[in-house]
């Protein structure tokens, strides 16, 4: 299966009538493996900040999480494994695997828990597969 198929079929899938606004799979080095048409252009320093927070949990909390120039308030995640961010009625979930970052961006009416489930389920599967 191509990385694009993982984005299209597993991240942008419909769940209870809702779906993510945007999604991507990005390597730890910031290289985009696959993304939805709506995923924002990320800056290298944004990926560096995210990777730093996985290595030193809490480092993004004071400044916020930036993705495509949009600032998200960092909320409770799983240190070293999942970063969650909130902006108004929407937000972002980022799951770290061995080689990649699985990123899902959502907005109302999708609930944060639905985004978490979609992103973390694919992330867990890819971890099991060695990615």
UniProtKB/Swiss-Prot annotation:
Family label: Belongs to the profilin family.
Record organism: Ambrosia artemisiifolia
Assembly and interaction partners: Occurs in many kinds of cells as a complex with monomeric actin in a 1:1 ratio.
One GO MF term attached to the UniProt entry: actin monomer binding
Keywords of this entry: Actin-binding, Allergen, Cytoplasm, Cytoskeleton
GO cellular component: cell cortex; cytoskeleton
Function of the protein: Binds to actin and affects the structure of the cytoskeleton. At high concentrations, profilin prevents the polymerization of actin, whereas it enhances it at low concentrations. By binding to PIP2, it inhibits the formation of IP3 and DG.
Primary location group: cytoplasm
UniProt cross-references to InterPro entries, sorted A to Z: PFN, PFN_euk, PFN_sf, Profilin_CS
Alphabetical list of SMART domains matching this protein: PROF
Subcellular location per the Swiss-Prot or TrEMBL entry: Cytoplasm, Cytoskeleton
Lineage top rank: taxon: Eukaryota
Protein name listed in UniProt: Profilin-2
Record's keyword annotation contains Nucleotidyltransferase: no
